[in-house]
Amino acid sequence: DFTVTPSIIKKFELNDELIFVGYGIEEANYNSYEKLDVNGKAVLIWNGMPENVETKRKWNISEKIELAKMKGASAVFIYSDKLEESLVKFEHFYNKPKISLVEQETEVQKEVPLITLTEKAAYDLLKSEKRKVKKIKKSGLKIKDAFKTSLRLSIDKPTDNYTSENVLAYIPGTDKKDEVLVITAHYDHLGKKGDIVYNGADDDGTGTVSLLEIAEAFQLAIKAGNKPRRSILIMPVSGEEKGLLGSKYYSQNPVFPLENTIANLNIDMIGRYDKAHENDSNYIYLIGSDRLSQELHDLSEKVNETYMNFGLDYTFNAEDDPNRFYSRSDHYNFAKNGVPVIFYFSGVHEDYHKATDTVEKIDFDKTGGLTRIYQILF
């Protein structure tokens, strides 16, 4: 009958009045809150817009929720005629456990919860006012007097705490030691489902072993007297598959100041080929290289042209890319904080997020060549 957002809210108590505010919008000729005081009260809002009423724009759900918060609402209930369809279509998503950082949960507990209702649940809450509400909904009239009902809601979800680790390997630089380059890959995958093991050889075993190879190469260079000018932080992160959690934690609790972090090079799935490159394996997708720093982008291209000559494919770097890869790996938490990034990626293949993503399908010549780029860049 209802869903609660944010989904990671684990404890919530509400014992108060619920006030129906109609469509929950505020315009010069139509103000849902004109005669209503909802401060400290829960509000019920219809989705959509009133018919036969001219408004400057169409209000979406997010805008209605923000307005309710500004009015002081303690909780927002919103009726959606698409909820029942959504509950059936995405049942697996609603039923699976949600994972978040402990710090994130603390912040979420302070948020005003959103409860999305089916039509039946919404009318059940309004009880005796059901007929009046239907009339207002159909006509688009404003509410002149508050429709109130008492409400008691208790949410208490069982939770488990788990500990996971990011791994940090630090290589101090020389004359530019205070400038830090962070190189990341995620070492987690999907684990087991029943008796089936999801190995994640490409996603992101290839990135993880690349970090090991890069670390080894830097140590050999240091022994030979060739220290990097800038400091290097090599960081396999955890929790990527559960919401980029490891890199999010680091970005919120950085060991080295983010303002001193010159770039993040992120390696995620570089050992296979996608259908677009079945006949040309000498390529790599670069994502984000020019979003925050043209200098980083130009340096990347120059190094590749001089030493490797990979085909650099920027298809997924487009801001309107429907795949949204720019926001789907760990570099994104650095980019959100203004750190220039490059995401190295060889594309999605038929074994993506399947138990068949296994090691014998990896092209190690490809991954080995790419690790040289990272070593040379800085």
What positions do the PLM features span?
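Protein/peptide-recognition domains central to ubiquitin and immune signaling
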Residues: 1, 78-99, 116, 126, ...
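Noncatalytic luminal/extracellular "stalk/propeptide" segments of secretory-pathway proteins
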Residues: 1-42, 47-51, 164
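A non-catalytic alpha/beta surface segment that caps or lines the substrate-entry region
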Residues: 1-20, 108-170
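Acidic, glycine-rich active-site loops and adjacent beta-strand->loop/helix elements
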Residues: 48-50, 81-83, 187-189, 235-242, ...
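Metal-dependent peptidase/peptidase-like ectodomains
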Residues: 103-106, 111-130, 237-343
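Acidic/His- and Gly-rich active-site-bordering loop/insert found
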Residues: 118, 161-190
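Alpha-helical metal-binding/catalytic segments enriched in His/Glu/Asp
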Residues: 167, 183-243, 374
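His/Asp/Glu-rich mid-to-C-terminal helical/loop segments that flank catalytic regions of hydrolases
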Residues: 209, 216, 345-378
